[in-house]
Protein backbone atom coordinates (compact mmCIF):
# COMPACT_ATOMS: atom_id res chain seq x y z
CA UNK A 1 0.00 0.00 0.00
CA UNK A 2 1.16 3.54 -0.70
CA UNK A 3 2.39 5.88 2.05
CA UNK A 4 -0.60 7.35 3.86
CA UNK A 5 -1.05 10.88 5.19
CA UNK A 6 -1.25 11.24 8.99
CA UNK A 7 -4.63 11.11 10.66
CA UNK A 8 -6.52 14.38 10.96
CA UNK A 9 -7.45 15.71 14.40
CA UNK A 10 -11.13 14.87 13.83
CA UNK A 11 -10.24 11.33 12.77
CA UNK A 12 -8.15 10.91 15.92
CA UNK A 13 -11.08 12.09 18.04
CA UNK A 14 -13.41 9.66 16.28
CA UNK A 15 -10.99 6.81 17.04
CA UNK A 16 -10.86 7.90 20.70
CA UNK A 17 -14.65 7.73 20.92
CA UNK A 18 -14.72 4.34 19.18
CA UNK A 19 -12.02 3.08 21.55
CA UNK A 20 -14.10 4.23 24.54
CA UNK A 21 -17.12 2.40 23.12
CA UNK A 22 -15.08 -0.79 22.67
CA UNK A 23 -13.82 -0.61 26.26
CA UNK A 24 -17.03 0.73 27.88
CA UNK A 25 -15.09 3.78 29.07
CA UNK A 26 -16.01 7.45 29.41
CA UNK A 27 -14.29 9.79 26.95
CA UNK A 28 -11.99 12.51 28.27
CA UNK A 29 -13.91 15.79 28.44
CA UNK A 30 -10.80 17.87 27.73
CA UNK A 31 -10.49 16.30 24.27
CA UNK A 32 -13.90 17.67 23.26
CA UNK A 33 -14.37 20.88 25.25
CA UNK A 34 -14.64 23.82 22.88
CA UNK A 35 -14.66 21.60 19.80
CA UNK A 36 -15.99 23.43 16.75
CA UNK A 37 -19.34 22.49 15.26
CA UNK A 38 -17.65 21.56 11.95
CA UNK A 39 -15.48 19.01 13.77
CA UNK A 40 -18.51 17.47 15.46
CA UNK A 41 -20.19 17.16 12.06
CA UNK A 42 -17.14 15.37 10.65
CA UNK A 43 -16.99 13.02 13.64
CA UNK A 44 -20.70 12.28 13.31
CA UNK A 45 -20.30 11.71 9.57
CA UNK A 46 -17.55 9.17 10.25
CA UNK A 47 -19.72 7.34 12.80
CA UNK A 48 -22.61 7.23 10.32
CA UNK A 49 -20.53 6.16 7.32
CA UNK A 50 -19.04 3.32 9.39
CA UNK A 51 -22.46 2.18 10.66
CA UNK A 52 -21.58 2.82 14.31
CA UNK A 53 -23.71 5.93 15.06
CA UNK A 54 -25.39 4.47 18.15
CA UNK A 55 -22.30 2.63 19.41
CA UNK A 56 -20.18 5.80 19.25
CA UNK A 57 -23.06 8.21 19.87
CA UNK A 58 -23.79 6.59 23.22
CA UNK A 59 -20.28 7.58 24.35
CA UNK A 60 -20.69 11.14 23.08
CA UNK A 61 -23.79 11.64 25.23
CA UNK A 62 -21.82 10.68 28.37
CA UNK A 63 -19.65 13.81 28.04
CA UNK A 64 -20.18 16.61 30.58
CA UNK A 65 -22.25 19.59 29.47
CA UNK A 66 -19.29 21.78 28.54
CA UNK A 67 -17.91 19.12 26.18
CA UNK A 68 -21.14 18.10 24.43
CA UNK A 69 -21.99 19.03 20.83
CA UNK A 70 -24.84 21.47 20.16
CA UNK A 71 -28.47 20.62 20.93
CA UNK A 72 -29.40 19.66 17.35
CA UNK A 73 -26.49 17.22 17.17
CA UNK A 74 -27.42 15.74 20.56
CA UNK A 75 -31.02 15.22 19.45
CA UNK A 76 -29.84 13.56 16.24
CA UNK A 77 -27.57 11.20 18.17
CA UNK A 78 -30.32 10.37 20.67
CA UNK A 79 -32.68 9.63 17.77
CA UNK A 80 -30.09 7.34 16.12
CA UNK A 81 -29.63 5.42 19.35
CA UNK A 82 -33.39 4.90 19.74
CA UNK A 83 -33.79 3.87 16.09
CA UNK A 84 -30.95 1.38 16.45
CA UNK A 85 -32.55 -0.15 19.54
CA UNK A 86 -35.90 -0.45 17.76
CA UNK A 87 -34.22 -1.87 14.67
CA UNK A 88 -32.57 -4.61 16.70
CA UNK A 89 -35.86 -5.44 18.41
CA UNK A 90 -37.48 -5.76 14.99
CA UNK A 91 -34.65 -7.98 13.68
CA UNK A 92 -34.97 -10.24 16.72
CA UNK A 93 -38.70 -10.62 16.09
CA UNK A 94 -38.19 -11.20 12.34
CA UNK A 95 -35.55 -13.85 13.03
CA UNK A 96 -37.95 -15.66 15.35
CA UNK A 97 -40.60 -15.69 12.62
CA UNK A 98 -38.07 -16.91 10.06
CA UNK A 99 -36.95 -19.69 12.38
CA UNK A 100 -40.54 -20.91 12.78
CA UNK A 101 -40.99 -20.91 9.00
CA UNK A 102 -37.84 -22.89 8.33
CA UNK A 103 -38.31 -25.25 11.28
CA UNK A 104 -41.84 -26.09 10.14
CA UNK A 105 -40.34 -27.12 6.79
CA UNK A 106 -37.59 -29.18 8.44
CA UNK A 107 -34.81 -26.79 7.42
CA UNK A 108 -32.16 -26.34 10.13
CA UNK A 109 -29.80 -23.40 9.66
CA UNK A 110 -26.91 -21.47 11.19
CA UNK A 111 -27.15 -17.74 11.86
CA UNK A 112 -24.12 -15.96 10.41
CA UNK A 113 -22.65 -12.68 11.73
CA UNK A 114 -25.12 -9.79 12.19
CA UNK A 115 -27.57 -10.31 15.04
CA UNK A 116 -25.51 -13.21 16.41
CA UNK A 117 -22.69 -10.78 17.29
CA UNK A 118 -24.70 -8.43 19.49
CA UNK A 119 -24.03 -10.60 22.54
CA UNK A 120 -20.36 -9.65 22.38
CA UNK A 121 -21.12 -5.91 22.65
CA UNK A 122 -21.32 -4.06 25.97
CA UNK A 123 -24.93 -3.27 24.96
CA UNK A 124 -26.24 -5.54 22.20
CA UNK A 125 -28.93 -3.03 21.23
CA UNK A 126 -26.32 -0.46 20.17
CA UNK A 127 -24.89 -2.58 17.36
CA UNK A 128 -26.30 -1.31 14.06
CA UNK A 129 -28.37 -4.11 12.56
CA UNK A 130 -28.16 -5.37 9.01
CA UNK A 131 -29.56 -8.34 7.15
CA UNK A 132 -30.46 -11.78 8.48
CA UNK A 133 -27.85 -14.16 7.05
CA UNK A 134 -28.64 -17.85 7.35
CA UNK A 135 -26.49 -20.79 6.29
CA UNK A 136 -28.26 -24.04 5.46
CA UNK A 137 -26.75 -27.42 6.24
CA UNK A 138 -26.87 -28.63 2.63
CA UNK A 139 -27.38 -27.46 -0.95
CA UNK A 140 -30.74 -29.24 -1.03
CA UNK A 141 -31.92 -27.36 2.08
CA UNK A 142 -30.71 -24.09 0.54
CA UNK A 143 -32.80 -24.69 -2.59
CA UNK A 144 -35.83 -25.62 -0.50
CA UNK A 145 -35.39 -22.49 1.61
CA UNK A 146 -35.31 -20.31 -1.51
CA UNK A 147 -38.43 -21.95 -2.88
CA UNK A 148 -40.21 -21.56 0.46
CA UNK A 149 -39.63 -17.79 0.51
CA UNK A 150 -40.58 -17.42 -3.16
CA UNK A 151 -43.88 -19.22 -2.63
CA UNK A 152 -44.56 -17.07 0.43
CA UNK A 153 -44.35 -14.01 -1.83
CA UNK A 154 -41.03 -12.59 -0.66
CA UNK A 155 -39.23 -10.73 -3.46
CA UNK A 156 -36.00 -12.28 -4.75
CA UNK A 157 -33.42 -9.53 -5.38
CA UNK A 158 -32.10 -9.19 -8.91
CA UNK A 159 -28.45 -9.40 -7.84
CA UNK A 160 -28.94 -12.76 -6.11
CA UNK A 161 -26.49 -15.44 -7.20
CA UNK A 162 -28.79 -18.42 -6.83
CA UNK A 163 -26.53 -21.00 -8.48
CA UNK A 164 -23.51 -19.82 -6.51
CA UNK A 165 -25.06 -20.20 -3.10
CA UNK A 166 -26.27 -16.71 -2.22
CA UNK A 167 -29.77 -15.26 -2.48
CA UNK A 168 -31.40 -12.18 -0.97
CA UNK A 169 -35.11 -11.76 -0.26
CA UNK A 170 -37.09 -8.79 1.00
CA UNK A 171 -38.56 -9.98 4.30
CA UNK A 172 -40.82 -7.37 5.85
CA UNK A 173 -38.64 -4.37 6.68
CA UNK A 174 -35.41 -6.32 6.45
CA UNK A 175 -33.55 -8.63 4.07
CA UNK A 176 -32.98 -12.35 4.47
CA UNK A 177 -29.87 -13.72 2.79
CA UNK A 178 -29.90 -17.47 2.25
CA UNK A 179 -26.49 -19.12 1.95
CA UNK A 180 -25.43 -22.51 0.69
CA UNK A 181 -21.84 -21.45 1.44
CA UNK A 182 -20.51 -19.27 4.22
CA UNK A 183 -17.55 -17.76 2.37
CA UNK A 184 -16.88 -16.56 -1.16
CA UNK A 185 -13.14 -16.41 -1.68
CA UNK A 186 -11.86 -15.89 -5.22
CA UNK A 187 -9.81 -19.08 -4.73
CA UNK A 188 -12.12 -22.10 -4.78
CA UNK A 189 -9.75 -24.18 -2.66
CA UNK A 190 -10.29 -21.77 0.23
CA UNK A 191 -14.06 -22.08 -0.16
CA UNK A 192 -13.85 -25.86 -0.16
CA UNK A 193 -11.64 -25.84 2.93
CA UNK A 194 -13.99 -23.61 4.92
CA UNK A 195 -17.05 -25.56 3.76
CA UNK A 196 -15.42 -28.71 5.12
CA UNK A 197 -14.83 -27.01 8.49
CA UNK A 198 -18.50 -26.01 8.67
CA UNK A 199 -19.69 -29.51 7.82
CA UNK A 200 -17.38 -30.94 10.47
CA UNK A 201 -18.89 -28.56 13.05
CA UNK A 202 -22.41 -29.63 12.06
CA UNK A 203 -21.69 -33.36 12.08
CA UNK A 204 -19.80 -33.20 15.40
CA UNK A 205 -22.60 -31.30 17.13
CA UNK A 206 -20.28 -28.43 18.09
CA UNK A 207 -22.50 -25.56 16.93
CA UNK A 208 -23.14 -22.90 19.58
CA UNK A 209 -26.66 -22.26 20.90
CA UNK A 210 -27.62 -18.60 21.40
CA UNK A 211 -30.70 -17.19 23.10
CA UNK A 212 -32.65 -14.43 21.35
CA UNK A 213 -35.77 -13.37 23.19
CA UNK A 214 -37.95 -16.45 23.66
CA UNK A 215 -36.15 -18.70 21.16
CA UNK A 216 -32.69 -20.15 20.49
CA UNK A 217 -30.56 -20.14 17.37
CA UNK A 218 -27.42 -21.99 16.25
CA UNK A 219 -24.15 -20.22 15.36
CA UNK A 220 -20.68 -21.37 14.39
CA UNK A 221 -18.27 -22.73 17.04
CA UNK A 222 -16.26 -19.90 18.59
CA UNK A 223 -12.90 -20.66 16.95
CA UNK A 224 -14.47 -21.06 13.54
CA UNK A 225 -16.54 -17.92 14.10
CA UNK A 226 -13.49 -15.80 15.00
CA UNK A 227 -11.94 -16.82 11.69
CA UNK A 228 -15.23 -16.42 9.82
CA UNK A 229 -15.87 -12.88 11.10
CA UNK A 230 -12.39 -11.90 9.99
CA UNK A 231 -13.05 -13.54 6.61
CA UNK A 232 -16.21 -11.44 6.29
CA UNK A 233 -14.16 -8.33 7.04
CA UNK A 234 -11.32 -9.51 4.80
CA UNK A 235 -13.54 -10.44 1.85
CA UNK A 236 -14.85 -6.89 1.55
CA UNK A 237 -11.57 -5.16 2.41
CA UNK A 238 -9.47 -6.09 -0.66
CA UNK A 239 -12.33 -5.46 -3.09
CA UNK A 240 -13.87 -2.19 -1.87
CA UNK A 241 -12.83 -1.58 1.71
CA UNK A 242 -14.34 -2.32 5.09
CA UNK A 243 -15.62 -0.21 7.97
CA UNK A 244 -15.42 -0.10 11.74
CA UNK A 245 -18.65 -2.00 12.38
CA UNK A 246 -17.12 -5.17 10.95
CA UNK A 247 -13.80 -4.41 12.65
CA UNK A 248 -15.55 -3.87 16.00
CA UNK A 249 -17.48 -7.14 15.62
CA UNK A 250 -14.22 -9.05 15.37
CA UNK A 251 -12.47 -7.22 18.20
CA UNK A 252 -15.38 -7.47 20.64
CA UNK A 253 -15.88 -11.18 19.95
CA UNK A 254 -12.25 -11.93 20.83
CA UNK A 255 -12.42 -9.62 23.85
CA UNK A 256 -15.44 -11.44 25.27
CA UNK A 257 -13.98 -14.89 24.49
CA UNK A 258 -10.51 -14.13 25.84
CA UNK A 259 -8.97 -17.25 27.39
CA UNK A 260 -11.68 -19.56 26.01
CA UNK A 261 -10.33 -20.16 22.50
CA UNK A 262 -8.14 -22.91 21.06
CA UNK A 263 -5.28 -20.83 19.65
CA UNK A 264 -3.67 -23.70 17.75
CA UNK A 265 -6.93 -24.39 15.93
CA UNK A 266 -7.32 -20.73 14.92
CA UNK A 267 -3.69 -20.50 13.79
CA UNK A 268 -4.08 -23.62 11.67
CA UNK A 269 -7.22 -22.28 9.98
CA UNK A 270 -5.64 -18.87 9.34
CA UNK A 271 -2.59 -20.44 7.71
CA UNK A 272 -4.66 -22.81 5.57
CA UNK A 273 -6.76 -19.88 4.31
CA UNK A 274 -3.73 -17.58 3.73
CA UNK A 275 -5.08 -14.84 6.00
CA UNK A 276 -2.68 -14.94 8.98
CA UNK A 277 -0.59 -11.91 8.00
CA UNK A 278 -3.65 -9.70 7.30
CA UNK A 279 -5.09 -10.83 10.65
CA UNK A 280 -1.85 -9.83 12.35
CA UNK A 281 -1.88 -6.41 10.67
CA UNK A 282 -5.47 -5.68 11.69
CA UNK A 283 -4.58 -6.81 15.22
CA UNK A 284 -1.55 -4.52 15.37
CA UNK A 285 -3.61 -1.58 14.07
CA UNK A 286 -6.24 -2.19 16.78
CA UNK A 287 -3.57 -2.33 19.48
CA UNK A 288 -1.96 0.90 18.29
CA UNK A 289 -5.00 3.03 17.43
CA UNK A 290 -7.86 1.58 19.50
CA UNK A 291 -5.98 0.61 22.70
CA UNK A 292 -7.02 -3.02 22.31
CA UNK A 293 -5.12 -5.38 24.61
CA UNK A 294 -2.67 -7.70 22.80
CA UNK A 295 -3.88 -10.48 25.10
CA UNK A 296 -7.25 -10.83 23.36
CA UNK A 297 -5.79 -12.11 20.09
CA UNK A 298 -5.82 -15.92 19.86
CA UNK A 299 -3.00 -16.10 17.32
CA UNK A 300 0.68 -15.03 17.23
CA UNK A 301 1.16 -11.26 16.86
CA UNK A 302 3.79 -9.49 14.79
CA UNK A 303 7.01 -9.09 16.77
CA UNK A 304 7.83 -5.64 15.36
CA UNK A 305 5.90 -2.60 14.16
CA UNK A 306 4.90 -3.19 10.57
CA UNK A 307 4.96 -0.28 8.08
CA UNK A 308 1.60 -1.43 6.69
CA UNK A 309 -0.22 -0.93 10.00
CA UNK A 310 -0.83 2.80 9.61
CA UNK A 311 -2.07 2.30 6.05
CA UNK A 312 -4.53 -0.31 7.33
CA UNK A 313 -6.18 2.11 9.76
CA UNK A 314 -6.19 4.92 7.19
CA UNK A 315 -7.77 2.66 4.60
CA UNK A 316 -10.49 1.56 7.01
CA UNK A 317 -11.26 5.18 7.95
CA UNK A 318 -11.57 6.18 4.29
CA UNK A 319 -13.61 3.10 3.35
CA UNK A 320 -16.73 3.49 5.45
CA UNK A 321 -19.18 0.61 5.80
CA UNK A 322 -18.33 -2.03 3.15
CA UNK A 323 -16.24 0.58 1.34
CA UNK A 324 -19.20 2.71 0.25
CA UNK A 325 -17.45 5.95 1.24
CA UNK A 326 -14.75 5.44 -1.39
CA UNK A 327 -16.45 3.45 -4.15
CA UNK A 328 -16.39 5.00 -7.65
CA UNK A 329 -19.30 7.31 -8.47
CA UNK A 330 -21.96 5.60 -10.56
CA UNK A 331 -22.27 6.99 -14.11
CA UNK A 332 -25.37 7.12 -16.31
CA UNK A 333 -23.68 4.70 -18.70
CA UNK A 334 -23.20 1.24 -17.16
CA UNK A 335 -20.00 0.65 -19.16
CA UNK A 336 -18.48 3.84 -17.75
CA UNK A 337 -19.48 2.66 -14.28
CA UNK A 338 -17.90 -0.75 -14.89
CA UNK A 339 -14.72 0.91 -16.19
CA UNK A 340 -14.49 3.06 -13.05
CA UNK A 341 -14.93 -0.02 -10.88
CA UNK A 342 -12.26 -1.87 -12.86
CA UNK A 343 -9.75 0.98 -12.47
CA UNK A 344 -10.52 1.27 -8.75
CA UNK A 345 -9.94 -2.44 -8.18
CA UNK A 346 -6.83 -2.48 -10.36
CA UNK A 347 -5.22 0.24 -8.26
CA UNK A 348 -6.41 -1.35 -5.05
CA UNK A 349 -5.06 -4.80 -5.95
CA UNK A 350 -1.63 -3.27 -6.65
CA UNK A 351 -1.60 -1.49 -3.28
CA UNK A 352 -2.67 -4.58 -1.36
CA UNK A 353 -0.49 -7.11 -3.14
CA UNK A 354 2.35 -6.81 -0.60
CA UNK A 355 -0.07 -7.63 2.22
CA UNK A 356 -2.05 -10.45 0.65
CA UNK A 357 -0.54 -11.61 -2.67
CA UNK A 358 -2.58 -14.82 -2.78
CA UNK A 359 -5.90 -12.99 -2.56
CA UNK A 360 -5.03 -9.64 -4.19
CA UNK A 361 -3.89 -11.41 -7.35
CA UNK A 362 -7.47 -12.61 -7.91
CA UNK A 363 -9.33 -9.36 -7.20
CA UNK A 364 -9.45 -8.12 -10.80
CA UNK A 365 -10.28 -11.32 -12.62
CA UNK A 366 -12.68 -12.52 -9.97
CA UNK A 367 -14.56 -9.21 -10.21
CA UNK A 368 -14.60 -9.15 -14.02
CA UNK A 369 -15.90 -12.72 -14.15
CA UNK A 370 -18.50 -11.98 -11.47
CA UNK A 371 -19.83 -8.91 -13.31
CA UNK A 372 -20.03 -10.81 -16.59
CA UNK A 373 -21.96 -13.67 -14.99
CA UNK A 374 -24.42 -11.23 -13.38
CA UNK A 375 -25.01 -9.52 -16.74
CA UNK A 376 -25.56 -12.86 -18.49
CA UNK A 377 -28.04 -14.03 -15.83
CA UNK A 378 -30.00 -10.76 -16.03
CA UNK A 379 -30.42 -11.16 -19.79
CA UNK A 380 -31.78 -14.65 -19.31
Language model region names:
Residues 2-130, 136-380:
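Conserved NTP-donor binding/palm subdomain of two-metal-ion nucleotidyltransferases/polymerases, i.e.
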Amino acid sequence: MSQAAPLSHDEELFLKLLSCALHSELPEARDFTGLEEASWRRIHRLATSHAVPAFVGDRILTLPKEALPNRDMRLMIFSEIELTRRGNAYLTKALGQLKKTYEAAGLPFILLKGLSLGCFYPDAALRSGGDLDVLFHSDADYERGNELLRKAGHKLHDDSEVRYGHTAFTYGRTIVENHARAVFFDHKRHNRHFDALVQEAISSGSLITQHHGDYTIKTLPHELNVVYIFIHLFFHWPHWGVGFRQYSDWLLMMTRLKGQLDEEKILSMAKDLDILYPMQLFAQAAIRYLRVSPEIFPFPLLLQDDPHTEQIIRDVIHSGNFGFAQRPIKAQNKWVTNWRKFRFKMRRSRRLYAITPTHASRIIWGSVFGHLMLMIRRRR
